[in-house]
């Protein structure tokens, strides 16, 4: 782990997933995600939309894809490609509608490049992401048991 302040640890129902946050790509998104993690926002949140060969989406407090923290983010599109293990912000049609929902790519998804804000990548536990139950919506979904910043984990 290179930078504990920018390393997020997700304990999921399928196992641990470690995400390296990239503040140089999306400083506003990284700051928001860190604040939500430290507030316990993601604890118990389900993976509500999981499409085989594409991505696993989480971060909706309702478990439906319709909710968020209530604080929209300005887009920080960047040149980082959407490849296996990329962590990117979900949004509605408006580019500046990202909030708390994010997704992890199972595979390359270049059609998302420059249209969604990449803010991190999975560095450990991608095999656990691969085990997340698929569905849209997911029946009896897997969840984030707890989310912590490595700097705060004892």
Predicted regions and their residues:
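Cyclophilin-like peptidyl-prolyl cis-trans isomerases
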Residues: 1-154
């Amino acid at each position: 782990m290179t930078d504990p302040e920018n390393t997020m640890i997700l304990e999921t129902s399928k196992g641990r997933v470690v995400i390296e946050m990239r503040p140089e790509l999306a400083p506003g998104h990284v700051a928001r995600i860190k604040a939500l993690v430290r507030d316990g926002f993601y604890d118990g949140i389900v993976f509500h939309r999981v499409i085989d060969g594409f991505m696993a989406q989480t971060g909706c407090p309702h478990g439906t894809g319709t909710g968020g923290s209530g604080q929209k983010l300005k887009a920080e599109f960047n040149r980082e490609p959407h490849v296996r293990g990329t962590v990117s912000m979900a949004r509605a049609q408006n580019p500046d509608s990202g909030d708390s929902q994010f997704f992890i790519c199972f595979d390359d998804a270049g059609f998302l490049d420059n249209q969604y804000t990449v803010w991190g990548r999975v560095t450990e536990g991608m095999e656990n992401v691969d085990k997340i139950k698929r569905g849209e919506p997911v029946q009896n979904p897997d969840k984030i048991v707890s989310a912590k910043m490595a700097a705060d984990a004892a």
